């Protein structure tokens, strides 16, 4: 057989690995550890697509490489299995979301195993397993005990027709719900919050210690949004009331010509004049219909209403009007801002819209034309005139503190984490509310609080989750006869994914989240690979929970993930017509290397786009494995380009990777393999070992594969192959194409054992030294010849060889040599006349 029969070989080795538990996590305490983590998937009904294996293959290559280097490797997989799609499916079909989820997991697992990933399936976790979410609930009870989980009335997007609140992302720009197109209103509801803000400073500072992409760290820094400025107190004219604004530029206070409160601010009704009451009430109602996202859109037209009241500017005593506007959010800062229209574009647009004064306090711009947002020396600012930004801020803060109308303040953009959902398919929150007004956490001995099985998962209609319909589960009585109700909200999908990497370390422990010694052994995660779309929320939440568990003494490290790598996106093949509109792949035919619309005959342009069901360009890995083999898919996805690049899927590229594997198969099975080394491949082999080793370490898998191809080309030029080089090459390709490597290893090594733990090959540095080197010969400054010569020849020897070359002789024939300049290992320059 002169080709790689993947249909026979791949299932054979997958069966062997499963039967022998080949990838069971090593526990030899004398070995170093390596923890390679994938972002575990949500097991959707659609199954895996070819984007999933890109990151999974990367961690698998590293895991196989580290095993061969003598490491204990922890390389697990599990399921982020709670989530809205399963609940929606259950509501639409009447099926149990647990059954639907179990079927999806079985399909995902089948697909993953068909790709030859070296996961330790003994450590599989599932966020919907009560034995798992017992510890999710345990973490929540600890947060509750420490005052970091609390209840609050917060405004939510309420849809009366759906009987539930929906997320900001589910509200359409016209203020209706994405599902059903129903009206959405903002109304306060009791919600569970987690006090992530208590960790803001640590979450920010500890980013500096992480080997993460700088772009991801910047996204987290911006999300946390630390601002140093001042709180300034404004009194309301003619009343005993006052309000506080936070500003990062207290030095511009002399330019504050109006103030703006959020429509929901607690002072609004109290200070609104009778003449303005109707306009204010109408505006408040309109604001309640908009999502926070829509309200803060910089591009939207500025709207607002004057309350009829005035504030007193504390620095100059001037009366300035108090407005309400929906771009100010009650949940952000103090829910009030001072407006300096000369130096803030949004304030400037608002002032122009409503004909409010604009006073320049920083020189350098033309504030009649636009806000001047650069720095400049202060003007029109009394005791701040002539000062720069830093000097003026220090002086005004000292003045505000002395006068008792302000103080220096650090604030964060980060808000506390809204942790409850009015849904069925999630972890029950282990809290009981008693009729005497107290609430208590479910004791650890009674965890897990198991999600009850029910067919009735429709919304309750009261704003509570469907669990409110289940009276038997809901109502409890204490030993002293006091009645209580269980919490009906469930946890968000983020909960189970915030700590799953810890459970992999000790997945069957019934006494604790994980054993302390094992956590010390394995943490932190050495590399975490996943999509950049999780840059903020998941990674920030996981870091928060980890730091909390560190404070409890549960985990030994301050951070969970030492190195993070975001793989790129695999784009689908798609086509555009002359208008730029995308055409579905089933409407395209290929003729003579070009693409045409089946119905119109129009020639189409090929253009990569995100894979989507609507474009019919999603590639199923099952189809690729069937036609080309799992090893081909693995090699192709790693060879497409840099791991972090977004690259279009190509059938031709897939075929090229398959041809390469067939060449590898023929090289090892057809070439005569000898016990003696004739030295012909010394340099090529040692170069390949060195390059592949270094490139795997730096995740440059595409260049590692290119180097493997270089070796195959060199080996094919020789009649015979030295056995140690054949073995070493098979080991080098094993992390990329493990099934092929296992099969070839048996033909060469004849040990009957897996290649997985055979020691990684090493290279001989002395064999990398070049014996020969190319030099150029220049005549009158122009290159006339290139010669291969022995390395490190003297100037005289170089000159002698150059002048003896036939091409050079012809060029200088009949000419007088003025001088010859020789530079060893580089060039010979002959000057003639």
From Swiss-Prot:
Short motif 'HIGH' region, span: 41-52
EC number: 6.1.1.4
Catalysed reaction, written as an equation: tRNA(Leu) + L-leucine + ATP = L-leucyl-tRNA(Leu) + AMP + diphosphate
A Pfam family matched in the record: tRNA-synt_1g
Chain positions of motif 'KMSKS' region: 610-614
GO CC annotation terms, alphabetical: cytosol
Name recorded for this polypeptide: Leucine--tRNA ligase
């Amino acid at each position: 057989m002169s080709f790689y029969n993947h249909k026979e070989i791949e299932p054979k080795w997958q069966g062997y690995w499963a039967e022998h538990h080949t990838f069971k996590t090593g526990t030899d305490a004398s070995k170093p550890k390596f923890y390679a983590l994938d972002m575990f998937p949500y097991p959707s009904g659609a199954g895996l697509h070819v984007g999933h294996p890109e990151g999974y293959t990367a961690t698998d290559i590293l895991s196989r490489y580290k095993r061969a280097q003598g490491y204990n490797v922890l390389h697990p997989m599990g399921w982020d299995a709670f989530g809205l799609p399963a609940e929606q499916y259950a509501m639409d079909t009447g099926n149990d979301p647990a059954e639907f989820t179990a079927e999806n997991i079985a399909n995902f697992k089948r697909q993953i195993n068909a790709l030859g990933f070296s996961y330790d399936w003994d450590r599989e976790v599932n966020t919907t397993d009560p034995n798992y979410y017992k510890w999710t609930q345990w973490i929540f009870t600890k947060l509750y005990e420490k005052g970091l989980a609390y209840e609050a009335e917060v405004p939510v997007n309420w849809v009366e027709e759906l009987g539930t609140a929906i997320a900001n992302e589910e509200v359409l720009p016209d203020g209706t719900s994405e599902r059903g197109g129903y009206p959405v209103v903002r109304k306060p509801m009791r919600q569970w919050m987690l006090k992530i803000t208590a960790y803001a400073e640590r979450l920010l500072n500890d980013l500096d210690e992480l080997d993460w992409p700088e772009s991801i760290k910047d996204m987290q820094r911006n999300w946390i949004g630390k601002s140093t400025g001042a709180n300034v107190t404004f009194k309301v004219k003619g009343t005993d009331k006052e309000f506080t604004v936070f500003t990062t530029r207290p030095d511009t206070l002399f330019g504050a010509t109006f103030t703006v409160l959020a429509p929901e601010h607690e002072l609004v009704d109290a200070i609104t004049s009778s003449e303005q009451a109707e306009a204010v009430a109408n505006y408040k109602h309109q604001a309640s219909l908009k999502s926070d996202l829509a309200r803060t859109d910089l591009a939207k037209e500025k709207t607002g209403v004057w309350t009829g009241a005035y504030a007193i500017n504390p620095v100059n005593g001037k009366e300035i009007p108090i407005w309400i506007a929906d771009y100010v959010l009650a949940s952000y800062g103090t829910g009030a801002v001072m407006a300096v229209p000369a130096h803030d574009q949004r304030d400037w647009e608002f002032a122009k819209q409503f004909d409010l004064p604009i006073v320049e306090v920083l020189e350098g711009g033309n504030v009649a034309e636009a806000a001047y947002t650069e720095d400049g020396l202060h003007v029109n600012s009394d005791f701040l005139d002539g000062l720069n930004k830093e000097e003026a801020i220090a002086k005004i803060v000292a003045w505000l503190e002395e006068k008792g109308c302000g103080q220096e303040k650090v604030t964060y953009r980060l808000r506390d984490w809204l942790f409850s959902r009015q849904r069925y398919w999630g972890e029950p929150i282990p809290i009981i509310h008693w009729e005497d007004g107290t609430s208590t956490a479910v004791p650890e001995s009674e965890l897990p609080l198991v999600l009850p099985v029910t067919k009735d998962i429709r919304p309750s209609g009261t704003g509570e989750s469907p669990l409110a319909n289940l009276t038997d589960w809901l109502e409890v009585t204490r030993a002293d006869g006091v009645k209580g109700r269980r919490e009906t909200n469930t946890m968000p999908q983020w909960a189970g994914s915030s700590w799953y990497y810890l459970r992999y370390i000790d997945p069957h422990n019934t006494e604790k989240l994980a054993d302390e010694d094992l956590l010390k052994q394995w943490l932190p995660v050495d590399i975490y690979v996943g999509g950049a779309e999780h840059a903020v929320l998941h990674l920030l939440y996981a870091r928060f929970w980890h730091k909390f568990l560190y404070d409890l003494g549960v985990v030994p490290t301050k951070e969970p993930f030492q190195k993070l790598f975001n793989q790129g996106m695999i784009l689908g093949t798609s086509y555009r017509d002359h208008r730029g509109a995308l055409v579905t792949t089933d409407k395209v035919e290929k003729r003579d290397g070009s693409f045409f619309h089946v119905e119109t005959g129009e020639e189409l342009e090929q253009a990569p786009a995100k894979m989507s069901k609507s474009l019919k360009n999603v590639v199923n890995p099952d189809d690729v494995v069937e036609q080309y083999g799992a090893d081909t898919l693995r090699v192709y996805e790693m060879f497409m380009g840099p791991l972090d690049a977004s690259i279009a899927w190509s059938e031709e590229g897939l075929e090229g990777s398959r041809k390469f594997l067939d060449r590898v198969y023929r090289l090892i099975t057809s070439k005569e393999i000898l016990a003696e080394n004739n030295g012909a491949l010394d340099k090529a082999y040692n170069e390949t070992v060195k390059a592949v080793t270094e490139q795997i370490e730096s995740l440059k898998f595409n260049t590692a594969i290119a180097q493997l191809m270089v070796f195959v080309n060199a080996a094919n030029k020789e009649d015979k192959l030295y056995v140690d080089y054949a073995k070493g090459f098979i080991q080098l390709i094993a992390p990329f194409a493990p099934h092929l490597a296992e099969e070839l290893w048996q033909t060469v090594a004849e040990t009957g054992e897996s290649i997985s733990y055979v020691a990684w090959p090493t290279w001989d540095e002395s064999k990398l030294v070049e014996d020969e080197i190319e030099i150029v010969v220049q005549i009158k400054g122009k290159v006339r010849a290139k010669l291969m010569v022995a390395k490190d020849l003297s100037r005289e020897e170089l000159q002698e060889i150059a002048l003896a070359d036939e091409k050079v002789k012809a060029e200088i024939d009949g000419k007088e040599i003025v001088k010859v300049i020789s530079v060893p290992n580089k060039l010979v320059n002959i000057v003639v006349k």
